[in-house]
Amino acid sequence: MSTVDSSSHTPMMQQYLRLKAEAGPLLLFYRMGDFYEMFYEDAEKAARLLNVTLTKRGTSNGAPIPMAGVPVHAMEQYLARLVALGESVAICEQIGDPAAAKGPVERRIVRIVTPGTLTDDALLPAKADRALAAVCLSGKRDPRAGIAWLNLASGEFHVTECAPAQLDSELHRIGPAELVYADSTELDITYSGARSRVPDWHFEADGARSHLLTHFQTDSLAGFDIEDMPVAVCAAGALLRYAARTQSQALAHVQTISAERAGMYVLMDPVTRRNLELTQTLSGEEAPTLFSLLDDCRTPMGSRLLRRWLHHPLRENAPVAARQQAIATLLSARLDMAQTFGAAGLLETLRSALGLFPDIERIAARLALRSVRPRELASLRDALATLPQLQTLVAPLSASPRLAELATQLTLDPAIADLLSRAIAQEPALAIRDGGVIASGFDADLDELRLLAADSGEFLVQLEARERERTGISNLRVEFNRVHGFYIEVSKGQTDKVPEDYRRRQTLKNAERYITPELKSWEDKVLSAQDRALAREKWLFEQVLDALSAYVRPLSDAAAALAELDALGSLAEHARRHEWVAPDLLESAEIDIDAGRHPVVEHAIERFTPNHCRLDATRRMLLITGPNMGGKSTYMRQVALIALLARTGSFVPARRARVGKIDRIFTRIGAADDLAGGRSTFMMEMTEAAAILAASTSNSLVLMDEIGRGTSTYDGLALAWAIAQRLITHNRALTLFATHYFELTRLPSEQATAANVHLAAAESAGGIVFLHEVREGPASRSYGIQVAQRAGIPAAVIRHATRELERLEAQGAPTPQLGLFAAALDAEAQTQAQADHDAENAALLALHEALSGIDPDSLTPREALEALYRLKALQ
């Protein structure tokens, strides 16, 4: 906001300017009664972004002050729109009593809402996390990137360190909604979320460490196993300071911090995550994706956990096997216990029970932040009442050690449910300010005040009857509204009968409203009781929150157990419904899939052709040839997704599968220009290939699709050959290498660990039939002519292409492109083709003679234009 001289303003506006200076560049929602008002540039910006009315209030230096506002009751929907636009908002509330204030009522900023610090359900996506992350870069001598990220809506706090070159991939893995970093730091990343800069001193080692020690109330960070991650500790300290400032309080629900180290997860760069369409399609849609297919969770927290699993496949076999065993136990229990649980079976009964639970993970976080709503506590109370039933369902599943551990986590202190059942009304109001939240019988003083207020109804009925009798006014009414309080209403035609002790309170068009000493005395008594009851209720609500805050950690643990049960149940149900199998887990890096299917594509088409794949120490690369539209890309993605599912602990779509330890998955699939970055399709292709060659290992899975197609034939072939050979001899990665260069099929004769496979197709009277079946050996042709015909290319163009192919083959063209135009034409087409060929030869001869007579270096611009028109006439 431009500099404003506050001395000439009213005390209220002076207060606003002080608070706006504190908020800085953030939009300031300044509470004034039933509205949050904005002034100056904030008002103009809000009016533009929110489409609210821009008005004026007072003047500044002779000019009207712009003002815009939003109703308090609708604040959340406006906040959601602003946050979606990447804006941050400071919320300023009235904390003083307007009745007692001699000047402006006391106000202060109570919280700051940013894209990464959301905790309110109305602002958060139900099935995705909105993490806040911080990045710290170390010096040039030993360059490291430290990353800390916090899910404020659950309290999960993590750190990791990586090489600066890996920072972008790590940020895409974490997927934060907001990134915090120092003022002096420059980041070369493709991350596109909100960014917030803070002073450099927030990241200083001593201060950051001290802040963490103070928060966790400990003398050492050794217990968190992060002492050897100094750069990440700097990021964590700065992040915690930033998050606490936005909430204007300590983050009591953030009770631990965990380190994620290299080797825990199968790494995937941003390109791979996008190409595999894990949680978002290539066009940016939420479905159909792997997540949308698998997510049949009954709780939002289960869906969020499943999403995290898909983005964090595990490298080690032990935790993968634990999930696998849990799914197998759920499936076997469904059959073994059908007699006990009826036709639905245990799995379905368990999943139905999970559907009764609210989002306890986020409720626990809001409880710690004192922003939990009364109805959320009521839903928590009702859920805890069903917890024993759920524990009964999980108890028989002890064949899985992991399920047995989850059953233990579900055990909560009965005092939580007892307090909630006694304290919270059966159907509480939306907010504590409305009253009716604390249950009757919980507090004797509150019950007495409520009784006093409730008795007013009987008193008013009796008063109305007495006054009608005393005045003779039969239509006299005693009523109440929030503006004028209690009053006696008399129609205009009866006002001459009004007694002397009636005092006029309000004049209407057809009636007069009065107050009497008796009614005034009762009003004071009742309104005082209502005010005192509400104040008492607010105080009691705070006491309930104080008592419940001691149970935030066990509630969070129970929520985590419920989420995992839900995610495992969803995977089990999908495996049951679609006949997925448990893959064998191997220690070595290999993939062996029998009759595998693409998990997403098979649901989109009527019939899907299963395929095999074997990659191991003796067969490290498959060179894949075959027709366009034959299914090469689908096959490659299918193998990668089955491997990824296996490493998450899920069952997989196959008859049988064996998947070993994989450290990374890379994909080079598809083509798209990077217009913003000024990079062509071919440049993008080479950049991705370079990253694969630099980072893939003998334990990596690499998918390379049509490398080299973005340049000339010779360049493309040479690059494809060299890249394929490098992957075999140097990187030794498990590689699926799809190509249209037929020459590459000679590579297996030189490299024993390479093999040819192709996507089969068959010709029929009606054209080509793509079998989508992977067979051993190279393809004989690509059937490009048939694909072109099916795409609607004109027949004349098809004939012309066929003639050109014949000419090239007659000249011994070095790169036939897999016999792209080798399909035979029928007799009529052959005759027409010969006639066209003869005519074209004559035209080409005339064109050649005309060109030989032109010296382009000696032509003037006008002569060049005339020559061009002569050549055009020869067409």
Swiss-Prot record:
Family annotation (PANTHER family): DNA MISMATCH REPAIR PROTEIN MSH1, MITOCHONDRIAL (PTHR11361:SF34), DNA MISMATCH REPAIR PROTEIN MUTS FAMILY MEMBER (PTHR11361)
A single GO molecular function term of this UniProt record: mismatched DNA binding
Pfam families tied to this protein: MutS_I (PF01624), MutS_II (PF05188), MutS_III (PF05192), MutS_IV (PF05190), MutS_V (PF00488)
Signal peptide: none
InterPro entries membership: DNA_mismatch_repair_MutS (IPR005748), DNA_mismatch_repair_MutS-lik_N (IPR007695), DNA_mismatch_repair_MutS/MSH (IPR017261), DNA_mismatch_repair_MutS_C (IPR000432), DNA_mismatch_repair_MutS_clamp (IPR007861), DNA_mismatch_repair_MutS_core (IPR007696), DNA_mismatch_repair_MutS_N (IPR016151), DNA_mismatch_repair_MutS_sf (IPR036187)
Keyword flag tRNA-binding: no
Binding, ATP: G626, P627, N628, M629, G630, G631, K632, S633
UniProt-recorded name of the protein: DNA mismatch repair protein MutS
Function: This protein is involved in the repair of mismatches in DNA. It is possible that it carries out the mismatch recognition step. This protein has a weak ATPase activity.
Keywords attached to this entry: ATP-binding, DNA damage, DNA repair, DNA-binding, Nucleotide-binding
Stated family: Belongs to the DNA mismatch repair MutS family.
Keyword presence, Nucleotide-binding: yes
A GO biological process held by the record: mismatch repair
GO CC annotation: cytosol
CDD domains documented for this protein: ABC_MutS1
